[in-house]
Structure formats: structure tokens, C-alpha cells
Amino acid sequence: MLRYYLKLGVLSIRANWALSGLMVAAIAIGIGACMTIVTVRHVMADNPIEHKNDQLFHVQLDNWNPNDPYEEPNEPPEQVTYLDSTALLEAGRAHRQVISFKSDRVVQPEGDGVLPFQQEVRSTSADFFAMFDVPFKYGSGWDADADRAEERVTVLSASMNEQLFGAEDSTGRTLMMNNEQFRVVGVLDQWHPVPTFYDLNNNPFDGPEEIYTPFSLAVTGEWGSSGNNSCWKPPEEGGYEGYLASECIWIQMWVELTDEANKEAYAQFLDDYVMEQKELGRFPRELNNRLSTPADWMVNREVVDETVSVLLALAVLFLVVCLLNTIGLLLAKVIRRGNDISLRRALGASKSELFKQYIVEAGMIGVTGGLAGIAMTWLGLRGIENVFADYDFISYLVTMDWEMVGLAVLLAIVSALGAALYPTWQACRVSPASTLRIQ
């Protein structure tokens, strides 16, 4: 019977191509507007490390002003001090631990006529690549011994390697930054976590850094942080050493804990550590340590802007308006086909058969509207990309994956079927006797 209903649906759409076209257009425009915003929000709220979400934790310690919290109502600082990050790293109580910050350096490419350029560099401890499942194309990262020895090694992204060395295996070659030599030990494969969950400061949609160096080397070289730096009181001593010994927060810390028992043990370790520091005159506030999963941390830092949520609500309302128009068009179509419906009822067609026929026809219109809606969504995303072309990160936010394509088609079908329920019910209520008597 499905083939028969599909055939009747095709004939009905052809016989009323204008009304059918308007319904497809209404659904496509509504789906396009809605899915454009849904896609942007989907990318913004994506968790690039979801498969390890229950194992990775962002560390927060509340070393802030005793009189005022870092953020209301009682949020601890989003970063940690050099003193605490290095002490916790050295303790090694987690399966893996990462401390890192970003810094601006001047890259000096090989060859005459190639101008130096400024580049943001991620200075991090050795576990960064293993903890965050960073893929390598050539070589590997450095180890903890290289961290302790402050070896001048570096890892390049695939795009930076192509820019500097023509995409060949550059392991063992030399990179010059700020007149200092670094030996390339690894080149990443394609890796673009968006948002950059491991550091949500500044703009989390700029994408990951292109160059990575050991944390200890950056500190010894007195590299400044190009990320957020916050202090609740000035350093007691001047210079870089005074900055390292201060209560200023500028380092992101993550730990990998394999199960709930390890998480509880590490949380207790943090409490014990802070209590020890209190005896030394630090941490004037009450215990307020936090361990947040990547998903929880992104919610905490409000990665999805409130404006996007408002736009999503407006887009859904616009889709509802389009569906109301579709309902009106379907009702008009039912009224125009009243004689045909009455004749079929008089010849023995049951209400259930009519219902199935019109639902199948509505589904066909929904599929067509969904496919057209995908095209409208693509146009909407390209429009956003063109309007905000000056922002380098915008290309990451306007990417439509297969999940969104499937959602668009499913939403179109469900919307069309939902819009068809009332007109179909009205069609089934048509009295064949009264209609044919009038004719």
C-alpha cells in the first residue's frame, strides 16, 4: 500500500503544484533559519574531548582575596598560580597532569626574504599530548625528563609545519624563535578542537596554538603570558621571580583521573594541600577547591553566548510561524479536494486509508522541504561567514556536519507531519453524502 500512497502523493503534488511549492518553501525557509542558528550553537557547545569527559578535570584552587570572591556568588579563580601548579605537578598524584599557558613569540623562518612573524605558543608540560589525545603525523611529544632538563624542543601543528618546512617530516630540524634555537621533535596531524576546552580564556574559538614548547623552558626564559593574568594583591617582590612567587593566577591546570575513587582521592589531596598552605599564611578563604569535567567547565565559563540562545529561540518561533502557514496551505488544499475525498469515501475508502494517504503526502513534502532547508542552511552559514569574515575563528562555527544534515531532514519531516495532522483530520471528517448531494 505504501507504493500506492506514494503514487497518489506524487499525483496530488503535481495537480496542486503551486500550493505544494508554497508548502515546501515555507518549510525550507523555516528549517533554514532554525538550523543555521542550531548549527552555530551546536559547534559552540561541542565537547571535543567527550570520549574522556569523565576522566579529565580542570583544577581550581581558591587563593583569592579573603574579603571578596573571584566571581560571585563564590567562584574560585579560573586559573592557578605558578607556585601551586608546579607543586601539584611535582606531587604527581594524578594519572596525568598538565600545566600550561600561552605566550607570544617571534618565529624566524629559514631562507632569505622570509620575514619573521609573531606567533602564539603553548608552553606546557609533557602530558599535554597524551592527555588530550593529540594525534601526531611525525615524531612525538617530549617526555617529563625533557621538561626537567629544560630541553629546547618543540612540536609544530600540521599547518605551521607546512608553512615553515613545506609539509615534509621536519623532526630533527631547527626552529628559530626570538633568536633561540629549538629542535623539532614532533609534527601534529590535523587537530582542531573547537572550542579549545583546555584554555577557555580570551576567545575559545580561535583554535589551538600552532607551536608547543616545554613549560619549564618558558619559565626559565622568563616568557610572559599572553593570556589572562589576574592578581588580588601585588607581588611582594619585583621582577619575574617575584611574579612567580606571587598570588597571581595565569596557568591552566588539568588532571586525568581514571575512576571515581581516584577523583575522590585527588580531591582529598587538594584539600590537604590547601590546608598545608594555610599554615604558611596563604589561602585566606575557606576551602573551595573544584574539579570540573570539560563539559561542566564549558558551562561554567558560558562558552555559548546568551545572544546565541536568544537567536535560537527567535529562530524556533520563526519555524513555528512557517508551520502555521503550512497548516493553512494544507487546509486550502483539503478544501479544494473536497469532491475527490467525498467520491473516494463513497466508493469505499475508509477514514484510516485517507489518513494514511495524506500523512504520506505530507511526509513527501517534508522530505522535499528538508532537502531545500539544508540548502537554505548552507546559504545562511555562508552569509554569517561573509558578514564576520574579519574574524579568523568564524570558519569553525559555520561548519555543518552530517549530524546537522540528518537533524534538518528529521525536523522537516516531523514538522510537516505535525502540520498535516489537523488538515488530515478535517479531510477525514468530510461527509461524502452532503458533498455529493450539493454537486
Predicted features and spans:
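Structured, solvent-exposed hinge/loop segments at the ends of secondary-structure elements
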Residues: 38-164, 168, 177-182, 196, ...
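Internal alpha-helical transmembrane segments of multipass membrane proteins
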Residues: 309-329, 376
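Transmembrane alpha-helical interface segments in multi-pass membrane proteins
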Residues: 324, 331, 339-385, 406-407, ...
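Membrane-helix entry/capping segments
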Residues: 3-4, 274-314, 336, 381-406
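A short amphipathic helical element positioned immediately N-terminal to and/or at the very start
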Residues: 2-14, 84, 88
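Mid-to-C-terminal secondary-structure elements
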Residues: 126-141, 152-300
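C-terminal membrane-exit region of the final transmembrane helix in multipass inner-membrane proteins
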Residues: 404-439
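Short, strongly hydrophobic transmembrane alpha-helices
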Residues: 16-50
